[in-house]
Amino acid sequence: MPRFLHVGCGPKRKNQTVRAFAASEWEEVTLDIDGSVKPDIVDKLPELSRVESGSFDAVYSAHNIEHLYPHEVPLALKAMLRVLKADGFAILTCPDLQVLGERLAAGDIDTPLYTSGRGPVSPIDMLYGFRPAMQQGNLYLAHHTGFTMKSLGSACIQAGFANFFGFRRPRRHDLWGLATKTRRTEDEMRELGKIYLMPL
């Protein structure tokens, strides 16, 4: 049975990832820095030091890399690459700075863009981190870096991934990317995207 590493899972589990991973064919192993959410592995980015090399078919990381400092991003991506099997791939999601930039250019940083399960999210929350959570002491949710589609793909390739495929969701204000450990054709990358970049 293929396994995926759910990095920075928080309270979410496989039925809140992507359609393919929610199926019974995939086994989920959860990882989080916060032991209170009861992950399978208590560990953190950028190191993933408690995860064996070449031990996973896929890595799923939703809205984690923006919480790293810029110099930690290459280390985190290399760690994801390290834990993947030879034909493995990583799925990454994060806020879309291009959409955010358009709102900032209009001078509006306070009007909510959308409402999350934790409450309204404004441009300033996307830029610096969700303020209500940080006010409650969860400083892990502070944002220290950000990406456009181009910069996310470049970061993955520079970290050693062979290919990158992704898309923007302007109405959802986020980016979705898939990076493979071994080289694939453009058609193969598109097919992988159709299968695995299907949010629930």
Description of each model-found segment:
Residues M1-G10, S116-I124:
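Conserved long hydrophobic alpha-helices within structured protein cores
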Residues R3-E102, A179-K181:
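Conserved SAM-binding loop
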Residues E72-A79, V83-K85, F89-L200:
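S-adenosyl-L-methionine-dependent methyltransferase catalytic module, highlighting the catalytic core
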